[in-house]
Amino acid sequence: YFTVGERMYLHTTAAGKAILAEYPEERVDFIVDRTGLPGQTDRTITSREALKRELDEIRQRGYALNRGEDQEGVYAIGQVATKPSGAVLGAISVAGPTYRTKKRRFEERLTSTLDGHIGKLEARLQ
């Protein structure tokens, strides 16, 4: 579970990685220089090279995944919301316990749901 207002590392969450994937490499480097890439679990990305590969995959796929990288046993999918200019508004993610999620089905069902909600959010905030 998470507490409202709790701060989390961007590289460990689906929403955070979705946001990082929208940023230029220089901004990602700046963030990593300030926060580092601390491991939260044994699945957390802790190297710049691995993070760069993950962000490239997110850009191609259109959504980010968290495979127990922030908390053991939690699987999440996240997408970013942007302004027409391309500026990041934020991100939305949906998470569930690993034991209750069939990963492929989880992704297939939730990407269209997230797409719809992201579209509504972007339309309302423009």
Enumerate the predicted regions with their spans.
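Short, solvent-exposed recognition segments
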Residues: 1-70
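Extended hydrophobic
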Residues: 47-120
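Cysteine/selenocysteine-centered motifs that mediate thiol-based redox chemistry or coordinate metal-sulfur cofactors
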Residues: 30, 36, 115-126
